[in-house]
Amino acid sequence: IANCLVGSEMCIRDRSDDKLNSFQDSKNEKYDTIIDATNHHIYPGIIALNTNLGLVEIDAVKASVDDDESGSYLPEIRSIIAYNAESKAVESMRPNGVLLAQIAPNGGVISGSSSVVQLDAWNWEDATVKYDQGIHINWPSPYTYGRWWLDEDRGLKVNNNYSSQVKGLKDFFEKSKANMNVNKSMNIKSKAMKSIINGESTVYLYADDEKEIVDGCLLYTSPSPRDSS
């Protein structure tokens, strides 16, 4: 429901052939406009959230996969730069009522920033509705599976490196904050972290269980990462 309310376009679907026959900008429509919707379904445009749409064309072709960069801490990665507005996958979305999408990166601990695009555009600049609207963080898991290639039991077990992985993420926050306070010529990673540390940017935290959610929220809301003093 929330996604539909945000959409700025209205779709009209013909019940007889189940196809979208009309797209109209709901912001510019006058309240006295009369639309003959007989035998039609009317609903707002849908937004695809947290998707690699336009970043991946064919999974098996490495050259067409741009949603996952090498490295662990990559806040400077901007998924919008790699967005392909002419992707065949993008073209298939509008006829099905999906008019906007949140293009998000994958991989690493800090994957990078996502942007919101509208799906009727010639290039990524034309498509962009909102630049770099949030940073995506994959929280470490307190559990892990055995590595079969090392002849380990494949069952679920406690991740003995969980504390050090969390500490690494916390240290990265603190280092970025320190660079902001003392170094005017910050490196690219610290610049990308500035909006998070100042509380100006949305953080999307990926977590699988209660402990990860609590630990992630405690890190981000603790005085250390966001203290502006």
Where is each model-derived feature located?
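N-terminal-biased segments
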Residues: 43-55, 166-177, 218, 222, ...
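Short secondary-structure boundary/capping segments
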Residues: 2, 26, 194-195
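Short glycine-/small-residue-rich flexible loop motifs, especially phosphate/cofactor-binding loops
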Residues: 2, 90, 217
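Histidine-rich, glycine-flanked metal-binding segment
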Residues: 8-9, 13-43
